[in-house]
Amino acid sequence: MGRLILEHTLQGHKGRIWGVAWHPKGNVFASCGEDKAIRVWSLSGNTWSTKTILSDGHKRTIREIRWSPCGQYLASASFDATTAIWSKSSGEFECNATLEGHENEVKSVSWSRSGGLLATCSRDKSVWIWEVAGDDEFECAAVLNAHTQDVKRVVWHPTKDILASASYDNTIKMFAESQLDSDWDCTATLSSHTSTVWSIDFDAEGDRLVSCSDDKTLKIWRAYHPGNDAGIATPDKQSVWKCVCTLSGQHSRAIYDVSWCKLTGLIATGCGDDGIRIFKETSDSKRDEPTFEQLTAEETAHEQDVNAVEWNPAVAGQLISCSDDGTIKIWKVDD
């Protein structure tokens, strides 16, 4: 049985911490929160410390931050309805671009695998796709109004230019660029949750997605592509996503975040009951009927809601979390 071992507890932000994001190299991370500031932390020896505080980019709470795949840029999504792009090209972090267009709070931001596209989503129910048009130039490529409520999260597929979004309307939607006319279309709607879908994450290959919800469940979805050997029909030659597993009974409140480790296959959740839980696919799991077990849980990981969890992309088994309690914690799963 694996255990979750606490390695570091870090403080610095004032108020609740909404987001944490590992740098692709895994030796730096960024955090953001209610204090309108971004902190960039780095590891020196065995000590994590704040190297930079970026406090002049936003007028309201910063909800989420994400590093570009190349690690040169940091995007921040804020309740002030803007997304800021930061880079260190001059040696110090500077805000190089501010993306405007959403009518309300921006809830999430995500870079495509190539770094050539950026997605944002908002309480205004829309998902925007931006093209990186050159140095610090971003052009709106699409405004997608497929959701009927607040959109909570956007995440790009790990190998293709497919975007997934999760919403207060209880659904997840998939978007892809049409091969006919370069318009972005909604290619799938994933319906099974009975309340807000707070977060989503793809597995390493991108053929499966995990979602977490206000309904206290985790769901695993699988893509069935045209010509699949399971005999699943694919109308219009579009991939069909089916819910193949539901995990319930482990969480006592809303699950706010989920992270699927690309290195180990473990799934971590951050919950409104202050806990962090780790799930592992069982050895006898079937492709079309997968089974997962709870590997370990830290029921009181934080003193208040756990807002975000993310596996380190470079260090297997290392997890970061942040909370309304104003702390960031770094954990290690001991197998």
Curated annotation (Swiss-Prot):
Keywords: Repeat, WD repeat
WD repeats: 12-51, 57-96, 101-140, 146-185, 192-231, 250-289, 301-335
Disulfide bonds listed in the record: none
Coiled coil regions in record: none
An example Gene Ontology biological process: protein maturation
A GO-annotated cellular component: cytosolic [4Fe-4S] assembly targeting complex
N-terminal signal peptide: none
SUPFAM superfamilies in UniProt: WD40 repeat-like
InterPro entries in the record: CIAO1/Cia1, G-protein_beta_WD-40_rep, WD40/YVTN_repeat-like_dom_sf, WD40_repeat_CS, WD40_repeat_dom_sf, WD40_rpt
Function: Essential component of the cytosolic iron-sulfur (Fe/S) protein assembly machinery. Required for the maturation of extramitochondrial Fe/S proteins.
Record family assignment: Belongs to the WD repeat CIA1 family.
Protein name: Probable cytosolic iron-sulfur protein assembly protein Ciao1
Organism: Drosophila pseudoobscura pseudoobscura (Fruit fly)
